[in-house]
Amino acid sequence: KATIFCADSSYPILAKHGIKPDYVLSLERIPLTSEFFNNDFGEFDKDILFVLKSYVHPHTTKYLQKNNRNFMLVSTYASFIQYLKLDYFGYFNMGKSVANMSYLLTEYLNYKNIILIGQDLAYAKDGFSHTKDYKNLDKHEGHFQRDKGKFQCLAYGGNGKVESSEIWTMFRLIFENDINYFQKFFNITTYNCTEGGARIEGTIEKPFLWACENLLDKDLNKPFEKLE
């Protein structure tokens, strides 16, 4: 009943729980991010389209090709890339994070109701930066202590403040700009169903269960037809 756009880091987590995304996106150029694709989930990967920024780390495409996963490379509006005259393949803006990239792709595919899940963009009360089954959790040790008190912002629901980081603050501000722009000019409604973390201005905050019961009322014919 929903189209699922999944960030690279969430892909192995969704696979672990048997939740199949329609699109998995990635834009990082570091080998650490490529490791999210160093796996073989077999039949689970059938009909998933992996959408990659055109200059991801080479290991990303190597791992995807190894298991014959279906992927495409897309480019942003960078001057150098446009000078190469690959206009036939098209471009789209991607923002600074894979979450921003996913959000922009939903707009280009003309979705009108967008549900955000897992976009905390803030530390949890226990200081953790990601879910406990996030693969690279150890890489963020000490970050909460480093950022505490420096990047506080309004909490989800409007009750009090939460601790954030410089990068998350940047991602949130980009989100807010895109959300308000698409609402104003394209009548796109964005729901934040994260149920925690930072408030993302311009979204409608609702529990995820509410979104499932009120927005997901039509079965979708998957896999989707290929666009020309």
Residue ranges and their predicted role:
Residues K1-E228:
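Metal-ion/cofactor- or nucleotide/acyl-coenzyme-handling active-site neighborhoods
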